[in-house]
């Protein structure tokens, strides 16, 4: 009967197993020493990156952030689009305003005057002769203003892309926020584009502290 005096195994009596257990204990101690000598044991574990917005560092930033949230909530909940129908896509735009989809439940109400609108839906083929009128209507809209390009013709010319009289995309005349593909896009697609515009407005940050302007 033999007693093995190895660290971690004091007081354990092993019967005839000195030769078999000894190398295992030595190997265990070697592995422990290598693990403790490695660089991973001395460096603390770094926390994982989190996709969370940074907290405001001052009361001023906190107030401005909350005001931004309030203004964005009011703005995205009361979008007033200006109808600028140029071709067959305008029929689907009217379909979205009909009772089946009822865009009024999202706060979207059509206005006849650009001075009362904050969204312009360009639906259809934009020609070179109509481009100045489009820009004039856009300039009459108050800030902040948004543009939704509806259909392939408004996005890039569509079926008439190679025509000499067609503008290859209304974004060459006015800045576009939302592109809706299709020829023509359905009323569901236009409604989805309006919801995406609301999400974009929700993330906007327009207010700034006076000393950071």
UniProtKB/Swiss-Prot annotation:
Signal peptide: none
GO BP terms in the entry: aerobic respiration; electron transport coupled proton transport; mitochondrial electron transport, NADH to ubiquinone; mitochondrial respiratory chain complex I assembly
Pfam families: Oxidored_q6
Post-translational modification Hydroxyarginine, affected residues: 111
Enzyme class: translocase
GO CC, alphabetical: mitochondrial inner membrane; respiratory chain complex I
Post-translational modification (record): Hydroxylated ar Arg-111 by NDUFAF5 early in the pathway of assembly of complex I, before the formation of the juncture between peripheral and membrane arms.
Region described as Disordered: spans on this chain: 30-53
Catalytic activity field: a ubiquinone + NADH + 5 H(+)(in) = a ubiquinol + NAD(+) + 4 H(+)(out)
Residues noted as binding [4Fe-4S] cluster in the record, renumbered to the chain: 88-89, 153, 183
Cofactors (names): [4Fe-4S] cluster
InterPro entries reported in the protein's UniProt record: NADH_UbQ_OxRdtase-like_20kDa, NADH_UQ_OxRdtase_20Kd_su
Cofactor note: Binds 1 [4Fe-4S] cluster.
Xref: SUPFAM superfamilies: HydA/Nqo6-like
GO MF, any single term: quinone binding
UniProt keyword list: 4Fe-4S, Electron transport, Hydroxylation, Iron, Iron-sulfur, Membrane, Metal-binding, Mitochondrion, Mitochondrion inner membrane, NAD, Oxidoreductase, Respiratory chain, Transit peptide, Translocase, Transport, Ubiquinone
Primary subcellular site in the record, as a coarse category: mitochondrion
Membrane topology: Peripheral membrane protein
Presequence positions on this chain: 1-37
The UniProt record lists the keyword Glycosyltransferase: no
Record flagged with keyword Membrane: yes
Subcellular location: Mitochondrion inner membrane
NCBIfam families per UniProt: nuoB_fam (TIGR01957), PRK06411.1 (NF005012)
Subunit structure: Core subunit of respiratory chain NADH dehydrogenase (Complex I) which is composed of 45 different subunits. This is a component of the iron-sulfur (IP) fragment of the enzyme.
Assigned protein family: Belongs to the complex I 20 kDa subunit family.
Protein name (Swiss-Prot/TrEMBL): NADH dehydrogenase [ubiquinone] iron-sulfur protein 7, mitochondrial
Organism: Pan troglodytes
UniProt lineage: Eukaryota, Metazoa, Chordata, Craniata, Vertebrata
């Amino acid at each position: 009967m033999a007693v093995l005096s190895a660290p971690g195994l004091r007081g354990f009596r092993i019967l005839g197993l000195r030769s078999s257990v000894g190398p295992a204990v030595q190997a265990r101690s070697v592995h422990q020493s290598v693990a403790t000598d490695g660089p991973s044991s001395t460096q603390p574990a770094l926390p994982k990156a989190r996709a969370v917005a940074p907290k405001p560092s001052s009361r001023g930033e906190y107030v401005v952030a909350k005001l931004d949230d309030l203004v964005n909530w009011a703005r995205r909940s009361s979008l007033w689009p200006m109808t600028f129908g140029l071709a067959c896509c305008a029929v689907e735009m009217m379909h979205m305003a009909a009772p089946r989809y009822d865009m009024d439940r999202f706060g979207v109400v059509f206005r006849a005057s650009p001075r009362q609108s904050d969204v312009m839906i360009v639906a259809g083929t934009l020609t070179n002769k109509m481009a100045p009128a489009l820009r004039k209507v856009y300039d009459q809209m108050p800030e902040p203003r948004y543009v939704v390009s509806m259909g392939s013709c408004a996005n890039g010319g569509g079926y008439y892309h190679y025509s000499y009289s067609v503008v290859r995309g209304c974004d060459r005349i006015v800045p576009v926020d939302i592109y809706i593909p299709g020829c023509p896009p359905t009323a569901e697609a236009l409604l989805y584009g309006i919801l995406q515009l609301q999400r974009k407005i929700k993330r906007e940050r327009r207010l700034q502290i006076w000393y950071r302007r």
